[in-house]
Design a protein with these regions (language model features):
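Regulatory and interdomain segments flanking nucleotide-handling catalytic cores
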Residues: 1-180
Length: 180
């Protein structure tokens, strides 16, 4: 089994690709995703392959990194399944994981996050949870997204340590984590 994330950057034309693309690359590199496992295509679309256990973590990390930039957001779909054909280009690979990711992406409409797996009951439950999480994530302010991402990447850090590393007050970190 593999996980495939298909995503589009929302409002990508409002921000220089140098800004969001470098943040995206750093996020994927810090998460241990090899460059050969992801691709930016059509200018602002992203597709990546990951282990299923890491797919949701990566999705939330990508959401947090894009929300750090004013007016930027991301729509993404996670597909879980087999990969039956691997190409040098991620976007040319194929299999149920890609089909599930593409189907979930096509069904997003106004949603920004969804998952499709071989298990319908699992999908129904998890997509309800993702809809609820998206109500908060879609409204993150840049500072909240930055603090959330720092906590996500460093779960053992105390709020005081996060505050020091981001040059913020501990009370602001506490407030942002509660809101996010």
């Amino acid at each position: 089994m593999e996980g495939v994330i298909t995503a589009d950057i929302i409002n990508s034309r409002e921000v220089s690709p140098d800004i969001w693309l470098n943040l995206l690359k750093d996020t994927l590199q810090n998460a241990g995703v090899e460059h050969s496992s992801w691709e930016v295509y059509r200018g602002d679309s992203i597709q990546l392959i990951t282990k299923p256990i890491n797919a949701l973590y990566l999705g939330i990390s990508l959401k947090a990194v894009t929300k750090q930039i004013p007016n930027l957001d991301i729509r993404m779909a996670i597909g879980i399944g087999e990969i039956t054909y691997r190409s040098e280009k991620v976007s040319s690979s194929n299999g149920p994981a890609f089909i599930n990711s593409g189907a979930a992406f096509d069904a997003l409409n106004k949603k920004t996050l969804a998952i499709k797996t071989p298990w319908k009951d699992f999908d129904e439950v998890l997509n309800i949870m993702l809809d609820l999480a998206a109500l908060t994530m879609d409204n993150w302010k840049p500072a909240m997204a930055e603090i959330f991402k720092k906590q996500l990447e460093n779960p053992t850090l105390k709020q005081v340590e996060i505050a020091a590393s981001l040059h913020k007050k501990q009370s602001n970190v506490s407030y942002s984590l509660k809101k996010s």
